[in-house]
C-alpha cells in the first residue's frame, strides 16, 4: 500500500475466528464507503477479536474505508497498545470511543461511529430524533444521547460515554455524529442504517418547518417499539440483509477479504 500504510497478508498468522472477524469488519468498512457514510480518513469501526485477550480490531489511521482489507486492520488491547506487527497508527479519538464501549458492553462485539451530514445535523438539534417516520420510531427505541466534550482524546470521557449509553444500541453524540453497536457486523450495520435513514428523513422533513410535521404520539411509538424487537433486528440483519450486502459488495467493491 502506498504512502507508508502496508498490508501484509495475515491470514496464516491468526486464528480462523479472528480471520472471520477481520473479513466481516473489512466488509463493513467498505459498505460504509459504498453507502456514503465515510468521512475521508476519519471515523472508525471496531470488532472484538474472539478469545480471552480482550483485543479488538480497528482501522489503520490514514487508510480510506474503500481500501480496507481483512489483513490491513490493526489489533489493539484495551490500553491502546498495538499487538500485531504493523507500522500503522490508530486514531486516538477512535480508541477512546471504541474502547469505552467494548470494555463496558459484552454484547457490543462490533462498534460503528460515523460523521454523516444528516447524522451530525440531527445531533445538533435540541429535540433530537423525532417520531415522524416509521424508520425513526424503530431507531428511537434504541437511542441514547451523549453531550459534546470536544475531540474524544480524554480517556476519562469513556466513563461518561458508557453511562449515557446504558444498555442502548444506538448513541447520538451531540454536535458530533452517530454510533451503533451490535453482536455482529450485520446487526451493527442494520442498526446504523435505520438511524442514518431516520436522520436523513428528519432533515428533509424539517425543511417544511416542525410546525407542519405530524409527530406520532407515545402510544403509537410504543406499538412500533413492540414490533421491532432486538431479536427480530438480529434475524433481519444476519440472516437476510448481511448476505445480500456481501453479494452487493462482491459485485461493486471486491477485495475486502484479503
How should each PLM-predicted stretch be described?
Residues 14-19, 84-92, 143-152:
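Flexible, glycine/proline-enriched loop segments at strand-loop-helix junctions
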Residues 47, 56-58, 145, 172-173, ...:
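Short hydrophobic-aromatic micro-motifs
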Residues 47, 101, 115, 161, ...:
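Divalent metal-coordination and catalytic microenvironments
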Residues 117-157:
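Class I SAM-dependent methyltransferase SAM-binding "motif I" and its flanking Rossmann-like core
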Residues 144-180:
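A contiguous binding-surface segment within folded domains or other stable secondary-structure elements
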Amino acid at each position: 500500500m502506498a504512502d507508508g500504510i502496508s498490508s501484509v497478508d495475515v491470514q496464516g498468522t491468526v486464528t480462523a475466528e479472528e480471520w472471520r472477524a477481520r473479513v466481516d469488519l473489512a466488509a463493513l468498512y467498505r459498505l460504509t464507503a459504498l453507502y456514503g457514510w465515510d468521512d475521508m480518513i476519519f471515523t472508525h469501526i471496531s470488532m472484538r477479536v474472539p478469545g480471552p485477550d480482550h483485543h479488538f480490531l480497528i482501522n489503520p489511521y490514514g487508510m480510506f474505508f474503500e481500501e480496507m482489507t481483512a489483513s490491513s486492520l490493526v489489533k489493539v488491547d484495551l490500553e491502546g497498545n498495538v499487538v500485531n506487527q504493523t507500522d500503522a497508527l490508530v486514531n486516538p479519538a477512535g480508541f477512546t470511543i471504541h474502547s469505552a464501549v467494548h470494555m463496558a458492553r459484552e454484547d457490543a462485539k462490533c462498534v460503528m461511529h460515523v460523521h454523516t451530514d444528516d447524522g451530525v445535523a440531527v445531533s445538533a438539534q435540541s429535540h433530537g430524533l423525532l417520531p415522524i417516520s416509521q424508520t425513526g420510531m424503530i431507531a428511537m427505541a434504541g437511542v441514547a444521547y451523549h453531550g459534546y466534550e470536544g475531540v474524544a482524546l480524554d480517556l476519562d470521557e469513556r466513563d461518561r460515554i458508557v453511562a449515557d449509553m446504558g444498555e442502548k444500541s444506538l448513541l447520538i453524540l451531540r454536535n458530533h455524529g452517530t454510533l451503533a453497536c451490535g453482536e455482529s457486523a450485520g446487526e451493527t450495520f442494520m442498526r446504523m442504517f435505520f438511524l442514518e435513514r431516520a436522520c436523513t428523513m428528519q432533515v428533509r422533513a424539517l425543511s417544511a418547518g416542525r410546525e407542519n410535521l405530524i409527530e406520532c404520539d407515545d402510544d403509537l411509538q410504543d406499538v412500533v417499539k413492540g414490533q421491532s424487537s432486538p431479536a427480530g433486528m438480529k434475524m433481519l440483519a444476519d440472516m437476510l440483509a448481511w448476505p445480500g450486502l456481501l453479494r452487493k459488495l462482491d459485485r461493486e467493491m471486491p477485495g475486502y477479504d484479503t
